[in-house]
């Protein structure tokens, strides 16, 4: 009987396959997304130097103040996207390469991307 690969292993394979093809630079960094069951994280990475330029997540106190008590997971993800776009703008970054890290472009990942685009980040 064949062993069935888990969804996490499949996502990890997709992530590695995509990371071979896309890289971020100082002018056009990689917008990386990580999604857990409870939180969502986004960071801008310059792969040439191996440096994280800025990051945003649901753990930040500024985001908790902005949202108050509600919003749901998708609303919170959109707010994280808006926050990462604002931080990128303050660094003078207009364009990014979107790295969804093997996740489907749906739900929270899509909401984060739309939030970043709404604040003027291009990808």
Swiss-Prot record:
Q: Name one GO biological process term.
A: translation
Q: Which UniProt keywords apply?
A: Ribonucleoprotein, Ribosomal protein, RNA-binding, rRNA-binding
One MF term from GO for this chain?
structural constituent of ribosome
Gene Ontology cellular-component terms for this entry are: cytosolic large ribosomal subunit
Check the record and name the InterPro entries matching this protein: Ribosomal_uL18_bac-type, Ribosomal_uL18_bac/euk
The UniProt entry, under CDD domains, shows: Ribosomal_L18_L5e
> At the top level of its lineage, which domain of life is listed?
Bacteria
Tell me how this protein assembles.
Part of the 50S ribosomal subunit; part of the 5S rRNA/L5/L18/L25 subcomplex. Contacts the 5S and 23S rRNAs.
Q: Which NCBIfam families match?
A: L18_bact
Job of this protein: This is one of the proteins that bind and probably mediate the attachment of the 5S RNA into the large ribosomal subunit, where it forms part of the central protuberance.
Task: Spell out the family assignment given in the record's similarity comment.
Answer: Belongs to the universal ribosomal protein uL18 family.
PANTHER family from the xrefs? 39S RIBOSOMAL PROTEIN L18, MITOCHONDRIAL (PTHR12899), LARGE RIBOSOMAL SUBUNIT PROTEIN UL18M (PTHR12899:SF3)
Report what the protein is called: Large ribosomal subunit protein uL18
Lineage runs: Bacteria, Bacillati, Bacillota, Clostridia, Thermoanaerobacterales
């Amino acid at each position: 009987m064949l062993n069935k690969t888990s969804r996490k292993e499949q996502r990890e394979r997709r992530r590695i396959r995509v990371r071979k093809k896309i890289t971020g630079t100082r002018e056009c960094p990689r917008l990386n997304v990580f999604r857990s069951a409870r939180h969502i994280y986004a960071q801008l990475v310059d792969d040439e130097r191996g440096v994280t330029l800025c990051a945003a997540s649901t753990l930040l106190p500024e985001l908790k103040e902005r949202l108050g008590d509600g919003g749901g997971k998708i609303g919170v993800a959109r707010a994280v996207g808006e926050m990462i776009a604002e931080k990128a703008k303050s660094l003078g970054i207009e364009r990014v390469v979107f790295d969804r890290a093997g996740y489907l472009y749906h739900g929270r990942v899509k909401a984060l991307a739309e939030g970043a685009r709404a604040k003027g980040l291009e990808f």
